[in-house]
């Protein structure tokens, strides 16, 4: 009997990607985050679609329309909070996914890694324009401050900012175009994710040891299907705990005040998942320097394959590099904390030291440590 799963042109693609895919037999739960990101994206697109049915992208009615969704639309409150907190879960999974890639040397798959970095930028852009839509105080001032950073670009900066704004300040035109961007970008993310997966399946997955696993492969279904389902159930559990018990835990109280261009909030800050980059931006007193540091803090990921000096791929058998990796994680958590603090002593100096340490670990200490480990093993 001909198996339709293996012969049908469309089903064959799905089969080779999710069913008969040969996978390493020893990949740990750190490899779950790819599928979790896929679930997050689907969840965000679905909840976002239902929100877009009731939302109006006009400065006069945007805030009221979000209130209307929460008060009057059937289960509108749960859809709204699933979307807002779903973004937080998305970024938690993203950071774990990137961290796994750094720890286990997955960045040696160049195409997959570079598409992944582009995906990270796209998701960050989507989250930023989405945060502007409720048109609260932090939405408005966040949009004003972050878009204003582009004015640091020499010669064309000011024109560029006014072009993005569609006027001389953040106003109706800005809100409308941000809604359009926020609607289209998730579909671009979905397309990029397919390309990401395409490149990954050209090489096959990495594994915790970093050693080629061609000699020991198992089919994706049922082993990793079950493992992924467990991860998905845990993700939904954490998301629903957040949505049903503490929906505003990760939000900003200022965003419950309608946008007012005449009243600046005492402390402008983005959502928690951007705070580490925001802290790096603020730690440099010069505007252009801050913007360059901000972009570099993410763009530095593209350099990871070039900075890999170890003879081993993974950090699994490299204790010194492991210590350095966890210091980097602690440094990023420190930056996240600093990003949410006011600009005053001692937070300024802590932020500057943490920012210097971030770049120093990645650009200097990691390559040196890897070389030392090579020499200790007489390689």
Curated annotation (Swiss-Prot):
Its cofactor is heme b. One of its GO terms (biological process) is mitochondrial electron transport, ubiquinol to cytochrome c. It is a multi-pass membrane protein. Heme b b566 binds at residues 97, 196. The chain crosses the membrane at residues 33-53, 77-98, 113-133, 178-198, 226-246, 288-308, 320-340, 347-367. GO terms for molecular function: metal ion binding; ubiquinol-cytochrome-c reductase activity. Binds 2 heme b groups non-covalently. Keywords: Electron transport, Heme, Iron, Membrane, Metal-binding, Mitochondrion, Mitochondrion inner membrane, Respiratory chain, Transmembrane, Transmembrane helix, Transport, Ubiquinone. Heme b b562 binds at residues 83, 182. PROSITE patterns: CYTB_CTER, CYTB_NTER. SUPFAM superfamilies: a domain/subunit of cytochrome bc1 complex (Ubiquinol-cytochrome c reductase) (SSF81648), Transmembrane di-heme cytochromes (SSF81342). It is found in: Mitochondrion inner membrane. Heme 1 (or BL or b562) is low-potential and absorbs at about 562 nm, and heme 2 (or BH or b566) is high-potential and absorbs at about 566 nm. The cytochrome bc1 complex contains 11 subunits: 3 respiratory subunits (MT-CYB, CYC1 and UQCRFS1), 2 core proteins (UQCRC1 and UQCRC2) and 6 low-molecular weight proteins (UQCRH/QCR6, UQCRB/QCR7, UQCRQ/QCR8, UQCR10/QCR9, UQCR11/QCR10 and a cleavage product of UQCRFS1). This cytochrome bc1 complex then forms a dimer. Component of the ubiquinol-cytochrome c reductase complex (complex III or cytochrome b-c1 complex) that is part of the mitochondrial respiratory chain. The b-c1 complex mediates electron transfer from ubiquinol to cytochrome c. Contributes to the generation of a proton gradient across the mitochondrial membrane that is then used for ATP synthesis. This is Cytochrome b. It comes from Rucervus schomburgki (Schomburgk's deer). The gene is MT-CYB.
């Amino acid at each position: 009997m001909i198996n339709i799963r293996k012969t049908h042109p469309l089903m064959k693609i799905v089969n080779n990607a999710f069913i008969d895919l040969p996978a390493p037999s020893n990949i740990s739960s750190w490899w779950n985050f790819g599928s979790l990101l896929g679930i997050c994206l689907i969840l965000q697109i679905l909840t976002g679609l239902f929100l877009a049915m009731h939302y109006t992208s006009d400065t006069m009615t945007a805030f009221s329309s979000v209130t209307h969704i929460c008060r009057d639309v059937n289960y509108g409150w749960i859809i709204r909070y699933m979307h807002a907190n779903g973004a937080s879960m998305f970024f938690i999974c993203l950071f774990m996914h990137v961290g796994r890639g750094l720890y286990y040397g997955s960045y040696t798959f160049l195409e997959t890694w570079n598409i992944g970095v582009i995906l990270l930028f796209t998701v960050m852009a989507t989250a930023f324009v989405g945060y502007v839509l409720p048109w609260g105080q932090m939405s408005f001032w966040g949009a004003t401050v972050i878009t204003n950073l582009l004015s640091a670009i020499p010669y064309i900066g000011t024109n560029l900012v006014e072009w993005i704004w569609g006027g001389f300040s953040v106003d109706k035109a800005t809100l409308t175009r941000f809604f359009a961007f926020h609607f289209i970008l998730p579909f671009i993310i979905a397309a990029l994710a397919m390309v990401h997966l395409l490149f990954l399946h050209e090489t096959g997955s990495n594994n915790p040891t970093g050693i080629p696993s061609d000699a020991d492969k198992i089919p994706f279904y049922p082993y990793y299907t079950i493992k992924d389902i467990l991860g998905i159930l845990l993700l939904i559990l954490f998301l629903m705990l957040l949505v049903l018990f503490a929906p505003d835990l990760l939000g900003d109280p200022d965003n419950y005040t309608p946008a007012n261009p005449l009243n600046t909030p005492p402390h402008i800050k983005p959502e928690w998942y951007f705070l580490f980059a925001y802290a790096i931006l603020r730690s440099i007193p010069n505007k252009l320097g801050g913007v360059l540091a901000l972009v570099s803090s993410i763009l530095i990921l593209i350099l990871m394959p070039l900075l890999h000096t170890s003879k081993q791929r993974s950090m699994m058998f490299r204790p010194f590099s492991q210590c350095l990796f966890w210091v980097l994680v602690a440094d990023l958590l420190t930056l996240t904390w600093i990003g949410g603090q006011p600009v005053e002593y001692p937070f300024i100096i802590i932020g500057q030291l943490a920012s210097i340490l971030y770049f120093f670990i990645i650009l200097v200490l990691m390559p040196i440590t890897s070389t030392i480990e090579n020499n200790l093993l007489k390689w």
